[in-house]
Structures are given as structure tokens and as C-alpha cells.
Amino acid sequence: MDVTLLKVTAILYLLASASFVVYVFLVRDSVANLSPVLLFAGFAVHTAALGVHFLQTGYPGIAQFREALSFYAWLLVAGYLLIQLKYRLAILGAIIGPLAFLMTLAAFAFGTGGGELPPGLKTYWLPVHVTLAFLGNAIFALAFGVSLMYLFQENYLKRKKMTSVMKRFPSLEALDKLNYVLLVWGFPLMTLGILTGSVWAGIHWGNYWSWDPRQISSGIAWLFYAAILHGRITAGLRGKKAALLTMVGFAVVIGYFLLGDSIFPSRHGGRFE
């Protein structure tokens, strides 16, 4: 992946993060429009970096862990920009901007050089499965950010402690509704990611389910999010409890994504023998 473009991306994400923090915590309306613009500029350069990688290697930049980190950050920013376009939720950028910057920076820690794609990954199932799975996870990350905002505001209101920062927050009802909308979008994508992964496993390994650690963790996360949605639809689950459960679900997803393969050996992560 192009090092220069990634460096520019990281710098723009950092500047956007700083701008969001100034807007939210220092209450500077003058940077209200600058923050999303900087993040969009970073997204545009990031898109170019992914495009250059594809032209140079012939495959999308999602096969190796460092590439996955970069792709995840790209999807996260794309999702936020769509939310900003529809809901004008600039304050969410104070969470998503730094997260995207840290993920892009972490990609550098694992190197930027390319490598030969393992034979088992030279298939159209790679972009289909990974894109669906990562889209679902990116939306869950956005739901995590919205849930964090909900808990932050709920805590302030409970203590009857109003500050200028609270003016940046939408109502608790609006945050709860957005959390639900994100779960409704993320869950089907996660489901399709798991299903396409199972089909791919059946084609490559001869069985659709082999109790691989990655499959088990995905199954657990799927059941957890299914339970949250079921509770929201049938049992009136909402508010603080829904926010807490959403955050726990994402902690499971991101925890295994970052640490799972190093703790539990798996045939994922490029090891497609």
C-alpha cells in the first residue's frame, strides 16, 4: 500500500480528530464545518491509497492484518460521513476520527510492504466475504460510538450537571433510535459475512463449519447481537441497557479481531492452507 498516501491519510485523520475535539469540548462553532471536511479529505486520500494498492497488486487491500486495519478504518469513516450527511451528528466524529487515526497508525506498525497473496485467498470470495463482514463490524463500531454518547449524556442528565458540551448532544431518544437503526443495518451484513465465509470454507476446506476459533467467536457475536435485536423488537429493550449491551457486543467483536488469532490459532488471517 502506498506509504505516502497512507501518511497523508493519517495526518488528515489526526487534524480532523483535533478539530472535532475543539468543536465539542472547547465549544468552538467556527470549526463546525471544518471537522467533517478534514475527515472527508482523509477519506478521499485513503480511498486513493486503497485504489493504488489494487492496481499494484491485483487484489484489494484486505488480505493481511495491516491491510485489514486500514480497510476497517476506511469503512468506519465512510459510515460516519453518511451519518453526518443524514443526521448532522458532528459530535460522533470526536469518537470516530481518533479511532480511524489510531487504526491507520497501527497499520504502519505492522509494516506497509506487500506480499504474495496465499493461493487460498486468490478467489472472488475474499472481497465478498471480507467486505460484508467488515461492513457489519464497522456499523457496530458506529453503534458503539452512539451508545457511548448515550451513556455519557445520560450520566450528566442524571447528575443534573449541564455543561456547554451537552449542547452538542442530540436527545437521548434520538441517540437510542440511531443505535437501533445501526443494529438493524449491521446485523444482516454480519449474517451475510458469516454465511459467505461458511460457503467459502465449504469450497476450500470441504466443510462449512469446522469449529475454527474465528467461526466460534463470530457465532457467539451473532447470537449476542441477535438477542439484543430480539429484545429491542419484542421486549422493549432500549435506553441505557441497550447501549451497554451494544458496547459489550462490539467489545467482543473488536477484541477478537485485534487479539484473537494471536491467542487462538486459526485458519483465518491469511493462513489459508
For each predicted feature, which ranges?
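Polytopic transmembrane helical bundles with strong interfacial aromatic enrichment
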Residues: 1-273
